Amino acid sequence: MTARSRPGYFRQEINKTIWEVPDRYKDLKQVGTGAYGTVCYALDRRTGAKVAIKKLHRPFQSDLFAKRAYRELRLLKHMKHDNVIGLVDVFTADLSLDRFHDFYLVMPFMGTDLGKLMKMERLSEERVQYLVYQMLKGLKYIHAAGIIHRDLKPGNLAINEECELKILDFGLARQTDSEMTGYVVTRWYRAPEVILSWMHYTQTVDIWSVGCIMAEMLLGKPLFKGHDHLDQLMEIMKVTGTPSKEFTAKLQSEDARNYVTKLPRFRKKDLRILLPNVNPQAIKVLDGMLLLDPESRITAAEALAFPFFSEFREPEEETEAPPYDHSLDEADQSLEQWKRLTFTEILTFQPAPAVAESKETAL
């Protein structure tokens, strides 16, 4: 069903909801749906580019939902890097604040993600180098803004057929009680300090995740595949070794300190034995990432300088984002205030100059 709506817009029913979209976008097809929104593929008539349009599910049903929607919009507006997903466009068909109920985020359409790619084929060392290099460039940029991803995994690393990678869902992930129990795939890439809430964590939680993802790319299977959060910790310590007394003393929680001191003793394993036939330069990168003590892990900027990435390295592309002001979206606001702020962000969006697509961008 399609019908006319606001001038310059058209209406279309997708997944039992009405979408109101500018005429510049055509051929809408649903490609995904989740807890917070539905995503459609579309073609941008203006540039010829393939795009992904996300409609949030009832973004203003509560002040919590409104806060989340505002934060997602602001984060996407802030990001301007080839390896981090950013906004092509943002729009609403609602003409005034009192009628404002829905808005749509437009992003580049990538086609697949690393999780799907790894299921389809074993990746060559050269592709691992190129993909991890892009992950680290994206993380250096995000971390410079003062943002921690918190939930890096193969499924939110989008890839197109040119093997270009963009990080998705940065800064939005929040740990919940439901994620701490059961068989959750995400856990396989989580840093130990996040799994057990050991301490106030830093940007190096993302470096741990990259180490897990890189090891899986080289090994062909997850490195740490625990059945619950305690089993996950045991799997990790079989490789990293049991924490030192110095590290245990840093744990803020007395319960965590007591728990760790009662664990079986494990000796640190040599990654060269776990990943035989892997380039020693790749092992050096993993050795710097997969350390139990977050303070000892390498940063994204340090990792980029490792010889393993020298073939693809272009330091001028390793840029840093300007600082992101967290105070705006952590403020205590009413639902109406969040709506007003979001509406203003949409009206003030400045798109990048349009560049026509010269190549396919979907896998």
Swiss-Prot record:
The entry's keywords: ATP-binding, Cytoplasm, Kinase, Nucleotide-binding, Phosphoprotein, Serine/threonine-protein kinase, Stress response, Transcription, Transcription regulation, Transferase
Annotated Pfam families: Pkinase
UniProt cross-references to Gene3D superfamilies, sorted A to Z: Phosphorylase Kinase, domain 1, Transferase(Phosphotransferase) domain 1
Catalytic activity reported: L-seryl-[protein] + ATP = O-phospho-L-seryl-[protein] + ADP + H(+); L-threonyl-[protein] + ATP = O-phospho-L-threonyl-[protein] + ADP + H(+)
Summary of activators and inhibitors of this protein: Activated by threonine and tyrosine phosphorylation.
Protein's UniProt keywords contain rRNA processing: no
Segments passing through the bilayer: none
Keyword Kinase: yes
Single Gene Ontology MF annotation: MAP kinase activity
UniProt-annotated location(s): Cytoplasm
Amino acids binding ATP: V31, G32, T33, G34, A35, Y36, G37, T38, V39, K54
Sites of Phosphothreonine modification: T181
InterPro entries on file: Kinase-like_dom_sf, MAP_kinase, MAP_kinase_CS, MAPK_p38-like, Prot_kinase_dom, Protein_kinase_ATP_BS
GO biological process, one term: intracellular signal transduction
Predominant location: cytoplasm
Domain comment quoted from the record: The TXY motif contains the threonine and tyrosine residues whose phosphorylation activates the MAP kinases.
Role, per record: Serine/threonine kinase which acts as an essential component of the MAP kinase signal transduction pathway. MAPK12 is one of the four p38 MAPKs which play an important role in the cascades of cellular responses evoked by extracellular stimuli such as pro-inflammatory cytokines or physical stress leading to direct activation of transcription factors. Accordingly, p38 MAPKs phosphorylate a broad range of proteins and it has been estimated that they may have approximately 200 to 300 substrates each.
Family membership noted in the UniProt record: Belongs to the protein kinase superfamily. CMGC Ser/Thr protein kinase family. MAP kinase subfamily.
Name recorded for this polypeptide: Mitogen-activated protein kinase 12
Organism: Danio rerio
